[in-house]
Swiss-Prot record:
It comes from Staphylococcus aureus (strain COL). It is found in: Cytoplasm. Residues 33-197 form the FAD-binding PCMH-type domain. The active site is at residues 176, 226, 296. Transmembrane segments: none annotated. Keywords: Cell cycle, Cell division, Cell shape, Cell wall biogenesis/degradation, Cytoplasm, FAD, Flavoprotein, NADP, Oxidoreductase, Peptidoglycan synthesis. Its EC number is 1.3.1.98. HAMAP family: MurB. Pfam families: FAD_binding_4 (PF01565), MurB_C (PF02873). It is an enzyme of class 1 (oxidoreductase). This is UDP-N-acetylenolpyruvoylglucosamine reductase. Pathway: Cell wall biogenesis; peptidoglycan biosynthesis.
Length: 307
């Protein structure tokens, strides 16, 4: 789909320096895997996102959105059409007890701003390696807290390029799910309503959560974060551990020996390695316990062409 007409049209909508052609996506994912994007766009304004989305819709060009690539696997075949990186939409503003943050802002950074202003409610996010857009998309959470507990609204763009402002209720936030996924929307910014707190207490809670995370999670290797959703009444990591799968490797990717809920890239692993290992773990746990493990990590892009 790389053609001159699309490139020239994009140049009319967004500055040329924000457009990359045939761009390797492994540079932008935590797994360090992924093929190329036909067109990789890095808008810095909401209006630029709207313009590109509207053009793509009118011309039936597929659009894919990327945040900081922390909970996603991109196949080696790459992504056709237009990939829009939202990382440059990274503003963070504080107004009384509320924080408004752009889609590309790291939720860790937003939690630290909350700390700076002695606002409580985002401590749970101090170790989540995702962007605001991704966090709202999947209702990210950790250690008993989640986005739906403190979000006020999200400003989104629909498939036609129109702006939509959704309240907490309208976002339909559920366990690792939201209306954003169901309606193929993209988050441009989100507002969080917090509460005044004591800085020392907020800091202490964040320090505790950070220590717990660092002691339990395999942060020394590239990974896609938590691979599976929590099955009702169970923990995915415990099921995988009890299936004796820790350390099991396919290609360069293995089930972490530190935390069975993670898969790490230990030796130049590929997206195909990740996908094959995920399927193997799902099959093994299903056979042993009769429990389906549903993915939390997103897998997108085309399979590599067979040589």
């Amino acid at each position: 789909m790389i053609n001159k007409d699309i490139y020239q049209a994009l140049q009319q909508l967004i500055p040329n320096e924000k457009i990359k052609v045939d761009e390797p996506l492994k540079r932008y994912t935590y797994t360090k895997t992924g093929g190329n994007a036909d067109f990789y766009i890095t808008p810095t304004k909401n209006e630029e996102v709207q313009a590109v989305v509207k053009y793509a819709y009118q011309n039936e060009i597929p659009v894919t959105y990327l945040g900081n690539g922390s909970n996603i696997i991109i196949r080696e075949g790459g992504i056709r059409g237009i990939v829009i990186s939202l990382l440059s939409l990274d503003h963070i503003e504080v107004s009384d007890d509320a924080i408004i943050a752009g889609s590309g802002a790291a939720i860790i950074d937003v939690s630290r701003v909350a700390l700076d202003y002695a606002l409580t409610g985002l401590e749970f996010a101090c170790g989540i390696p995702g962007s605001i857009g991704g966090a709202v998309y999947m209702n990210a959470g950790a250690y008993g807290g989640e986005v739906k507990d403190c979000i006020d609204y999200a400003l989104c763009v629909n498939e036609q390029g129109s702006l939509i402002k959704l309240t907490t209720k309208e976002l339909e936030l559920d366990y690792r799910n939201s209306i954003i996924q169901k309606e193929h929307l993209v988050v441009l910014e989100a507002a969080f309503t917090l509460a005044p707190g004591k800085m020392t207490e907020i800091q202490a809670k964040m320090d505790d959560l950070t220590e717990r995370r660092e002691s339990k999670q395999p942060l020394e290797y590239p990974s896609c974060g938590s691979v599976f959703q929590r099955p009702p009444g169970h923990f995915a990591g415990k099921l995988i551990q009890d299936s004796n799968l820790q350390g099991h490797r396919i290609g360069g990717v293995e089930v972490s020996t530190k935390h069975a809920g993670f898969m790490v890239n230990v030796d130049n692993g590929t997206a195909t390695d990740y996908e094959n290992l995920i399927h193997y773990v799902q099959k093994t746990v299903k056979e042993k316990f009769g429990i389906e493990l549903n993915r939390e990590v997103r897998i997108i892009g085309e399979h590599p062409k067979e040589s």
